Amino acid sequence: MAIQLTINGKPQSVDVPPNMPLLWVLRDTLGMTGTKFGCGMALCGACTVHIDGEATRSCITPISSVAGKKVTTIEGLSPNRSHPVQRAWIEVDVPQCGYCQSGQIMSAAALLAKNAKPSNSEIDEAMKGNICRCGTYQRIREAVHRAAAMHAASAKPARLDGALPTDDALDKQLVEAGGAA
Ligand code: FES
Ligand code: FES
C-alpha cells in the first residue's frame, strides 16, 4: 500500500514495504542522494534528516512511521544554499572529504531552530551523534556560531517597538528559511 508523506514541501506517495528505512526510500526510490549511508545502525549521523523539525536518523526509521509527516533533507534546506548554516559552512570551509557533512548540516540546522545562540557545550551535545572521520569538529563548532550570528543579525531589526524578537519568532524565521520545515 502506498505511503503518503511530504518531502521538502512536496507531497509524495511511495509504494514500498512498510519496514523499508526512510534512507532507502530517499536514495533508491526517489533518487535523492544528498543524504548519506554510513553505518545503518544510528551510530554515525550521516543519514540525518528532519522529521517534523526533529533531527532523525533515517537509516533506522521505517517509512511507515513517517506517513503523514514532513521530511526535510539536505536538498530541501534551502533552494539556493542560502540557509544560514549552509552559508556558514561555506564561509568556514568546514568539509574535508564531505561524506558526513549533509548529516552535520541537518543536525546543526535543527539545533539552531530550537536554540538560536547555543554555547560550545550545547553544540557539542547536539552534534555528538554526528561522527566525522576527517575530524572537522572545530570548524563545525565555529560554523554553528557563525550561522547563529548571521541569523541574529538578520532577525534583530524585525520589531519596530524596540522589543527583541521572541524565541518563537526566531524559530519561525529559521523555519521559513528552510531550517525545520
Ligand atoms: S547511517 Fe544512519 S546513523 Fe549511520
Ligand atoms: S568531512 Fe570527511 S567524514 Fe566528515
Label every model-predicted segment.
Residues M1-A181:
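Signature of N-terminal electron-transfer/Fe-S-associated modules in redox systems
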